[in-house]
């Protein structure tokens, strides 16, 4: 399944979450596209709930189904809870860390920064959004990209940086100082549904 590249607000309304992180998509019309008003939806089956939860998380991080499933399988080989490990692995993606540092306003924009070669890891350019960032690695904006307008605009509006990352706005560098705890990740996601979905 290819990555969705259409309007994110449509997916946000269908899934009931804000993919942009601003919540603006749901302010005016907090119901699915195609509905003529906030009417009650049909009762969803258990399978439907599980699938919807999977779609929420997949679209949140902007992954294809194949990327999502591969990461899920990788998480299953680690010690601990499968669902939590899965969410932590998603959080360790380079494009997500760039987003968490405030260098991009959305994960989609962060993925473009990485793809276009604006980001380095430990001083070496990395243009693979799925690159897994390890604790202690230094993420920086390339010197040639320091005046990138998209980065500057994002830094002007970004204020919240999670405790598990550190960021130096003057040097445009940051790092993953520890793995996040489950309580620090998306509270609106029930990862148990996703584990159940793939366990069928």
Curated annotation (Swiss-Prot):
Give any GO molecular function from the UniProt entry: structural constituent of ribosome
| UniProtKB keywords | Ribonucleoprotein, Ribosomal protein, RNA-binding, rRNA-binding
Q: Which GO terms fall under biological process for this protein?
A: ribosomal small subunit biogenesis; translation
* Stretches assigned to the S4 RNA-binding domain: 92-170
Under the heading Gene3D superfamilies, the entry gives: Ribosomal Protein S4 Delta 41, Chain A, domain 1, RNA-binding S4 domain
Quote the CDD domains the UniProt record gives: S4
Q: Using the UniProt annotation, give all residue ranges assigned to the region (Disordered).
A: 22-43
A single GO CC term for this protein reads: small ribosomal subunit
For this protein, the record's Pfam families field holds: Ribosomal_S4, S4
SUPFAM superfamilies attached to this UniProt entry: Alpha-L RNA-binding motif (SSF55174)
- Can you tell me which family this protein belongs to? Belongs to the universal ribosomal protein uS4 family.
Subunit (UniProt): Part of the 30S ribosomal subunit. Contacts protein S5. The interaction surface between S4 and S5 is involved in control of translational fidelity.
Q: What does this protein do?
A: One of the primary rRNA binding proteins, it binds directly to 16S rRNA where it nucleates assembly of the body of the 30S subunit.
Protein name per UniProt:
Small ribosomal subunit protein uS4
Natural source organism = Listeria monocytogenes serovar 1/2a (strain ATCC BAA-679 / EGD-e)
């Amino acid at each position: 399944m290819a990555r969705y590249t259409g309007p994110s607000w449509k997916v946000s309304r269908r899934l009931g979450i804000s993919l942009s992180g601003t919540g603006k998509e749901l302010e005016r019309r907090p119901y699915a596209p195609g509905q003529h008003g906030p009417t009650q939806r049909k009762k969803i089956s258990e399978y439907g709930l599980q699938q919807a939860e999977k779609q929420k998380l997949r679209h949140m991080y902007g992954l294809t189904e194949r990327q999502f499933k591969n990461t899920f399988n990788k998480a299953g080989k680690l010690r601990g809870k499968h669902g939590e490990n899965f969410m932590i692995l998603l959080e360790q993606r380079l494009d997500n860390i760039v987003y968490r540092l405030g260098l991009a306003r959305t994960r989609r924009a962060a993925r473009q920064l990485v793809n276009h070669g604006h980001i380095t890891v430990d001083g070496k350019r990395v243009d693979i959004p799925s690159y897994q960032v390890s604790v202690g690695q230094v993420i920086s904006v390339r010197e040639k990209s320091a005046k990138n307008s998209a980065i500057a605009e994002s830094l002007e509006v970004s204020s919240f940086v999670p405790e598990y990352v550190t960021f130096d706005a003057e040097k445009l560098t940051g790092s993953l100082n520890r793995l996040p705890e489950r309580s620090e990740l998306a509270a609106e996601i029930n990862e148990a549904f996703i584990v159940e979905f793939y366990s069928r």
